[in-house]
Amino acid sequence: MRTVDLFSGCGGMSLGFQSAGYNIVAAFENWSAAIECYKQNFKHPVIETDLSIVDEAIIRIKKYQPDLIIGGPPCQDFSNAGNRTEGERAELTHSFAKIVTAVKPKFFVMENVARASESEAYKKARKLFIDNGYGLTEIVLDASHCNVPQKRNRFFCIGGLDQDDGFLSAILRAKQTVLPLSVRDYYSEKKYTLEFEYYYRHPRSYKRRGIFSVDTPAPTIRGVNRPKPSEYKKHDSDPVDPSNIRAMTTRERARIQTFPDTFVFPENTANTEQMIGNAVPVQLATFVASSLSDFVDGKQYSCNMQFIDWLKGNKGFTNRAAGDIVSRIIRANKIVPIKQYTGFDYVNKLDSTKSFKSIKPVVQSQVKRAVRLYFEYLDISTKEPEVTLHDSGT
């Protein structure tokens, strides 16, 4: 699929989609430092372009005839404060939508911070997508359940021309891992040498801890990397004494963003740290890319639609709530295959499984409730349990 990357930065999203088999034909970026970094890592052109000048951008992008446009418009202006303000960079979300709806690719993927979905700029963009015939899948993904060793929640709007809303939701939910990926497990998977058991990440407030273990996902990698201050005192939530604990190096942070060690970054440390923090984690991009490929190739989640209709019609669930139930059933099925047990026996087996016990109690309760609903549906419908990805043959 011919793909163009907008607001490409140093290339995290490009690399993720390229790794999933997409043909990246061009990238567009306006930060010269990121452009130079991109050029060192990709063979296709990266074009310096101010994407806020929409008419000029459309002319340039149309030349590449993309089937897919991907991109993460800058998100710094989506304030997290009580009185949320939006500036010029937030408006670039609307620019992205104007470009997409003028170029008219078959699909698009837009990434942003989770709170961007509530912004006025996104609401305008969303209306533009819908008015131009795009069905939308809107979802917040936790990167640690998408093959990234980092707790990073990101909003994705994935559009398909003439597709139904939510066309990719089931596949995205089905492909997520049951357990989050820890730093230790990621290092083991990649055969990296783990030189630390704990590390420092500068807290936004002195009321928060700064020391973290490699046995959990890392907190969100940000655009700055500060060393541990000499005056730092142990926080109540710090797992160990901080005396001999250091911050991650630039390359270690890049690994947490799932950039391979072969990816070349510039020597300017400040620029590099910002590029790393701003990037879409490579394997999160690959996760979304492979999910879209599954859809295009005809692979669909096969939990029959009658179950979803039953949840909405008989139990009063909204579309979103029914989707959450399905997501929890998928999660349970990955731990213990549903087809092997009846309802009561299945819940008992689930309770005795080590990986299920490691999940937070509140989540365990949610999963078991979802499973009970599914078996209740099966009892009255005589349907066979269907909770896998299958190839429909299309």
PLM region descriptions:
Residues V54-L68, P73-T220:
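Class I S-adenosyl-L-methionine
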Residues K315-T382:
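Non-catalytic DNA-binding core/recognition domains of DNA-processing enzymes
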Residues R2-I24, L128-D131, R154-S302:
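S-adenosyl-L-methionine-dependent DNA methyltransferase catalytic core
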Residues E36-V46:
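Short, conserved SAM-binding/catalytic segment
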